[in-house]
A protein has these predicted regions:
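Active-site nucleophile loop of the alpha/beta-hydrolase fold
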Residues: 12-13, 57, 108-117
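Short beta-strand/loop motif that positions the catalytic acidic residue
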Residues: 145, 150-153
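Flexible "cap/lid" loop of the alpha/beta hydrolase fold
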Residues: 102, 112-139
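Catalytic histidine-centered segment of alpha/beta-hydrolase-like enzymes
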Residues: 63, 181-192
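Conserved alpha/beta-hydrolase "acid-adjacent" motif
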Residues: 157-163, 186
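Gly/Ala-rich beta-loop-alpha elbow adjacent to hydrolase catalytic centers
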Residues: 84-94
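Short, surface-exposed "cap/lid" segments of acyl-processing enzymes
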Residues: 2-47
């Protein structure tokens, strides 16, 4: 029997607030909690024999990119790895791949942010945002990804909007468009479309 890929699910920067409280401080929103779509996906994949990691960056909403990189450097990533990144986590994965030159099986970006997010005058800037988004993602990254890049978006996402469009020609990405998922908050309990894309 063929060995399953290992999967890394990476959260975003959790800038969202609920009743004035940062989402990152709500236990349900821990990426490993089975009550949200990321933890649910991890559980489903593990039941099917995948090795899955949902790493957590400490104080993520104010963490420098170097803290993300240090965490990613500790993970097992090889040509059988599937990387999944939400929002800023998607950008962090692309930047890290660009810097390390590692090859992976597949990359799935969910509501991906890009360096263009810093150009939005209406949003509150996160700490170290300019430094976080300092790397230019180029089309040469495609050579490090064996299968097609997949981007999952929701039509009603008000956080990154259409920012994903720059990645489509750059990475020859296929887009999966969903309805009523917003910015894929961890208040969403399941994301079967992601589970399906990982297993393809």
């Amino acid at each position: 029997m063929k060995q399953k890929s290992n999967v890394i699910l990476l959260h975003g920067r959790f800038a969202e607030r609920i009743e004035g409280k940062l989402i990152a401080d709500i236990p349900l929103c821990n990426p490993n909690n089975e009550g949200n779509w990321m933890g649910w996906t991890k559980k489903c994949l593990e039941e099917k024999g995948y090795v899955v990691a949902c790493p957590v960056v400490a104080d993520v909403w104010k963490a420098r990119y170097e803290e993300w990189r240090e965490m990613l450097d500790q993970l097992t990533v090889n040509e059988d790895t599937i990387l999944v990144g939400l929002s800023a986590g998607g950008y962090a994965l692309l930047r890290w791949l660009s810097e390390t030159g590692k090859r992976v099986k597949k990359v799935i970006l969910i509501a991906p942010a890009s360096k263009n997010i810093a150009n939005d005058p209406d949003r509150v800037k996160m700490p170290y945002e300019d430094e976080f988004y300092a790397c230019e993602i180029t089309s040469s990254l495609k050579d490090q990804i064996q299968e097609q890049v997949v981007i999952i978006i929701s039509k009603d996402d008000e956080v990154v909007g259409r920012m994903y469009e720059g990645y489509v020609p750059l990475l020859s990405a296929r887009v999966v468009t969903l309805e009523n998922r917003g910015h894929f908050s961890f208040l969403i309990p399941e994301l079967p479309e992601l589970l399906e894309e990982i297993q393809k």
